[in-house]
Amino acid sequence: MKLKRFLLPILAWSCLLYTSPSPRHEEFTGHLSSLQVGNVVCSDGNILSMDKFKQSDKEAVAIVFHINRSAETDNLGYAVYIHDMEPLAFADSLGIDQGTSASLTDEDGNENTYSLFNNDEVKSPIAIRTFDLWSYGQSAYIPSVRQLSFLFTVRHQINECITEVGGTPINLNPSECWLWSSTEVEGQKENKAWLYSMQSGTIQETPKDQPHKSRPVISIYTTK
């Protein structure tokens, strides 16, 4: 699927650069109470219930998997892309701290991915590919360990939704379930980052030059 031709509205929406009134969301009114796990994020920025999506002619790009209830967060929640990214390395060589937080509890995949992309000492194939998904820079990002834990909790429900919109379900088979997080390993940041198992919810420190799949996410914001 060629994403670059139709995802500018999502970029504008998710980066809060959208200056005119918020787009018509039908089910999603711009308020936290109207956002539900399993809602469909469309290529034009609309967020629909599954029933509304099936009645539309819109194209799905992501499924809402987490709603943020904390007043301390700057977004309403997260949505996961309906396809895997191909296996790529976290870094194209070892020996460089790429500047991620290394936190196992922070919801900071967006910041981590930018650090990977913006590092002048080593290239990050997964960060570069994630940026290439979108027309004008960052919108999608590689989730942190914490954000992947949210996805793990609802993985079966999200897989049903992904299948309904024609996407590729998250692989839960033991040999194919590992996804890169955007989190480096504390004390070994020069050489290792965390893989997350969508089958068991465990994490495994892994050399950063090894290719593995990833599943980009987006944050959901509103201008209201």
Give names to the regions the model predicted.
Residues 123-139, 145-199:
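An exposed tryptophan-centered "aromatic clamp" motif
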Residues 6-14:
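Sec-dependent N-terminal signal peptides
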Residues 1-5:
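Positively charged n-region of N-terminal signal peptides that target proteins for export
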